[in-house]
Structure formats: C-alpha cells, structure tokens
Amino acid sequence: MKSTPRLSEILIDSLRVETWIGVPDAERMEAQEIEIDIRIQPARNFAEMRDDINLTVDYAAVCQRVSELARERPRRLIESLAQEICDMILSEFAATSAQVEIRKFILPETRHVAVRCASEATER
C-alpha cells in the first residue's frame, strides 16, 4: 500500500560550535562551545526526492554554514544567533520552515540555558 506523506523533516541534533557570545564583555573574550538543534522542513517531501541528493537539504552543508555563521562575529544574545540561523537556512536552502534551539552552558547551577525560534519561508 502506498502512503500519503504528511510531514518530512530533517533533524540535526546537538551540533557543537564555538562562538563568542554573551552580554558581559568579558564573556565574549574567549570562545565558548554551544549546542544547536535544528529542525528543517524541506520544500519537497521525502517521497518526491527519489533518492536524489539535489532534491533535498544537504545537512552537512547546513552544519558547515551554521558553524561559519556562529564564528563570523561576536554577539551578545543567543537569541540573535538563533534567528540568524533560521533566516540563513530559509534563504540559502530549499526549506519551508526552520526551527533552531541553542543551548549555552554558562550558569553553574543549571545544565544549560536555551532559546528556541521557528520561522517559515515567505514566498520566493
């Protein structure tokens, strides 16, 4: 029996990148490792891709671009970086939506702090 695709998503779990991020100037002086989860809804569902890499979102390329973007410049807020990653995915890859969660390991009394954002592509 043939199925009807309802949802196709590409998930990148716990991508570790180094960046300079934090509100205090001293915190941005040294690079720190953050973790990023990314959820991408490609423009085509998996059934339409016919095992063709050119018809999907290349997750290795996404990881490379996220790492480059994170290292591009210092930022105060992980919120800013999360939105920039969503925007980059939607503008550079064939995706209809992107969700990004960034975890930062800065407060000793917590495992991590995190932010999450989700964006949808506007018509191209």
Predicted regions and their residues:
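N-terminal, polar/charged subdomain of small-to-medium soluble alpha/beta proteins
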Residues: 1-124
